[in-house]
Amino acid sequence: MGGFLTGTTDIFYWALMIFAIGQIKILQYKFKNLGKHALALMDKSKMSSDEAVNHCMKKCIILHQIIINYVTDVDDLMKPLMLMDFAICSMLISVVGIQVIVSGFGIAQVSSLQYLSSIMGQLFLFYWHANEIILESLDVSIAIWEGQVYSYPLNVQKSLQFVMLRAQKPLTLNVGPFYAMSTTTALSVLQAAYSYVALMRQAYS
């Protein structure tokens, strides 16, 4: 029962993260094709070129702000869970490592390693999706530039420059108040755990 609840909770959180990644990709597409969308809007309405571009830009900026608020809300929701998972995973790595050092490798350690590998796989899925959110949010500014921002009216260019500046600050999901989740920090966690186990091995040898 506990495993089922844990699995469904994890899937729910992964879905929240994948949704954020998808929305950022949609935003990139809209920024990259801002001129095309403005032309399509001009064909459907009586707007001038400048009005159409300005209208499409405002919709993109609103979507960007919605995504920022959404990721912030998801981060607030996940922070305690990620902190708890980090603590459990770190403790398990240390315990299993010490067991192997003190008692040798046996059946008990095999089951512990199996559980540990599932916990680590779970954590890496969280860290990988969080890393994708970081990378995709940074790519928003690239998408704006690829949309030929310099060809738009001056007021639109200035507004898009502010968006590009905001996009330089990546959207992150964090482990409690400590650090942002990414593949780099995931490897750092493993390195720290390995260092602790290596230290314990030295102490027991």
Locations of the language-model features?
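Membrane-embedded alpha-helical segments and the immediately adjacent membrane-proximal loops
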Residues: M1-S205
